[in-house]
Amino acid sequence: MDSINIMEKFSLFNEQWTPKIIGELNGQYVKICKLKDAFVWHSHENEDELFMVFKGTLLMDFRDGRTVRVSEGEVLIVPKGVEHRPHTNGEIVFNLLFEPKSTLHTGNVEIPLTVKKLNWI
């Protein structure tokens, strides 16, 4: 059992929208990912999704027309079943996620960016 330097882990990869696992607890993975520009509209039928921004500003669009701004040090929890689309204003955002191990980052949508086997770093 060792501490994890999250910012150091972010320095180990450049891919965007490709979560990396840095830990697990209680049937969930602790994941980090870099986000830039717009992702796909999607939802997670059985899982809530927690976004915690370490660097930059994440914007989360919802189908009701709202956009929620998530700044450094802030958290947004998207309830299961709620369609959402994360995006940025062109900057690379460092994000941490807590999700059940079975959660696909693209939720109910399969696209070329869908990663079914996540890597540990």
Where are these regions (language model features)?
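Double-stranded beta-helix
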Residues: 2-10, 23, 85, 89-121
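A short glycine-rich, His/Asp/Glu-containing loop-to-beta-strand
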Residues: 6-41, 47, 107
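Short, surface-exposed charged micro-motifs
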Residues: 21, 50, 59, 67, ...
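A cytosolic small-molecule/anion-sensing beta-strand core signal
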Residues: 26, 54-55, 71-72
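Short acidic/polar mixed-charge low-complexity motifs
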Residues: 28-29, 58, 66, 82
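Short, conserved beta-strand element in jelly-roll/cupin
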Residues: 34-35, 44-63
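Short beta-strand His + acidic residue motifs that chelate non-heme Fe in jelly-roll/DSBH
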Residues: 41-42, 60-61, 78, 83-89, ...
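Short acidic-glycine-tyrosine-enriched beta hairpin
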Residues: 64-80
